[in-house]
């Protein structure tokens, strides 16, 4: 079992951790999150971005991680970026706790997410169904108030 973690920080009150666990290269990856300080009772986009560079805040993380050159989509879509995790749901206090298994995200192997950045967005991900060009790239999920580089745990 290989485990990786990202500690979320940014220019907002949003903090938390996102962990990734994968047993072997062909196994799905379990993604778990515990995030506090976001908007209450909301759905907010969460994606893995290309670069592990946070020198200019979360904006320097670049676009969604997309090694197969697909368009943006929902985590359950056949056509999607590797980094497309959809939306997290927050409770009345703005906290989100959850987990999901994903077949495209890899901790182990050539398309590993290690050293890349996970970003929690300020808006809701439209899952590529927004009817415009930006939707097919970002899901119109908006600004990047918190992020963290994914590293071996």
Swiss-Prot record:
Disordered: annotated span: 126-145
Disulfide links within the chain: 58-147
EC number: 1.15.1.1
Glycosylated residue positions: 24
Entry similarity comment: Belongs to the Cu-Zn superoxide dismutase family.
Assembly notes: Homodimer.
Role, per record: Destroys radicals which are normally produced within the cells and which are toxic to biological systems.
Note, other: Protects mice from mortality after experimental infection with influenza A virus (strain A/Aichi/2/68).
Name of the featured protein: Superoxide dismutase [Cu-Zn]
Species per Swiss-Prot/TrEMBL record: Humicola lutea
Lineage: Eukaryota, Fungi, Dikarya, Ascomycota, Pezizomycotina
